[in-house]
UniProtKB/Swiss-Prot annotation:
SUPFAM superfamilies: Glucocorticoid receptor-like (DNA-binding domain), P-loop containing nucleoside triphosphate hydrolases. GO terms for biological process: DNA biosynthetic process; thymidine metabolic process. ATP binds at residues 8-15. GO terms for molecular function: ATP binding; metal ion binding; thymidine kinase activity. The keyword Metal-binding applies. This is Thymidine kinase. It is an enzyme of class 2 (transferase). The gene is TK. Belongs to the thymidine kinase family. Its EC number is 2.7.1.21. The keyword Kinase applies. InterPro entries: P-loop_NTPase, Thymidine_kinase, Thymidine_kinase_CS. Substrate binds at residues 117, 161-165.
Amino acid sequence: MSIEIITGPMYSGKTTELIRRITRYKLCKKNCVIISHSIDNRHDDDNILINHDGFKISHDDFIKTNILINKIKIFDKYEIIGIDECQFFDSNDLIIFCDTLANNGKKIIVAGLNSDFNKNPFKSIIKLIPISEKITKLQSICNFCYNDATFTMKKFNKDIIIEIGGSDLYIPVCRICYNENNTIN
């Protein structure tokens, strides 16, 4: 059917938008599931998805995993499949999974960061763009000047590219503030 991407920096509302879209389809009696990578520790338990604002959605069909393609048959019963924090999944696994299911009539809604704190794109997003029907890029609010923020800046531990954290570790910033303040240690 189709693949939709929701992307942007930290605190731009990607998970919130994913939850909103899935909820709309659930109201239309569609069979929906949300997948999150098992590395994501924002979840209270296996049946609750929570965003950085603390908004929770209880979801009977919520799956945490680190590998997608070997579980593809599990998703036959679902019409709408949401994937949160896609940057944590292996990019080839994610692409094959999304493309296969979309080609078999499923709507896939993928949410993930547009880039790491060095402004390097995540392969999962880059590889999804050519096979997607819809891309939504969200913005946050700059932590310094309160203008629109399109980048994520890491406060410390800058030698570790993938590190799970919240506002204790990452902040959204605009281009100017990224360039002026990217030496925070």
